[in-house]
Amino acid sequence: MTGGKSGGKASGSKNAQSRSSKAGLAFPVGRVHRLLRKGNYAQRVGAGAPVYLAAVLEYLAAEILELAGNAARDNKKTRIIPRHLQLAIRNDEELNKLLGHVTIAQGGVLPNIHQNLLPKKTPKSGKGPSQEL
């Protein structure tokens, strides 16, 4: 018996690489896989399902954070707060449809004034053609 840390693996084996890094993702594929197994969504979970779900979650997070960052910059802030998330989601048609039933704590509401409540515009009399005969 030889002493060492090989543990029965081939001597030329590569270093361990996470499934997230193999897929080029920042979201944890292993954790998503564990949550899919423990959540009783199905008896069995395929190998590609957690990778795909982690990629979708990462894309959604990136999309929302980009729009929220733009909202924060428009308000001359450097930190994203729940209000910026609310503005980002409600001003985007597809995200609003996806997250329409979601309540964001401390998000506030969108600024909106009904047309009937706005002051009436009065026609200006002046340089128009004369109505006299």
From Swiss-Prot:
UniProt subcellular location: Nucleus; Chromosome
Family matches, as SMART domains: H2A
Chain positions found as Phosphoserine: S130
One Pfam family, short name: Histone
Motif [ST]-Q motif per UniProt: ranges: 130-131
Residues flagged as site, Not ubiquitinated: K120
Keyword Phosphoprotein set for record: yes
Alphabetical keyword list: Acetylation, Chromosome, DNA damage, DNA repair, DNA-binding, Methylation, Nucleosome core, Nucleus, Phosphoprotein
Annotated GO CC locations: nucleosome; nucleus
GO BP: any one term: DNA repair
Assembly and interaction partners: The nucleosome is a histone octamer containing two molecules each of H2A, H2B, H3 and H4 assembled in one H3-H4 heterotetramer and two H2A-H2B heterodimers. The octamer wraps approximately 147 bp of DNA.
Other noteworthy facts: In contrast to vertebrates and insects, its C-terminus is not monoubiquitinated.
Biological function: Core component of nucleosome which plays a central role in DNA double strand break (DSB) repair. Nucleosomes wrap and compact DNA into chromatin, limiting DNA accessibility to the cellular machineries which require DNA as a template. Histones thereby play a central role in transcription regulation, DNA repair, DNA replication and chromosomal stability. DNA accessibility is regulated via a complex set of post-translational modifications of histones, also called histone code, and nucleosome remodeling.
Domain notes: The [ST]-Q motif constitutes a recognition sequence for kinases from the PI3/PI4-kinase family.
Name assigned to this protein: Histone H2A
Organism ancestry: Eukaryota, Fungi, Dikarya, Ascomycota, Pezizomycotina
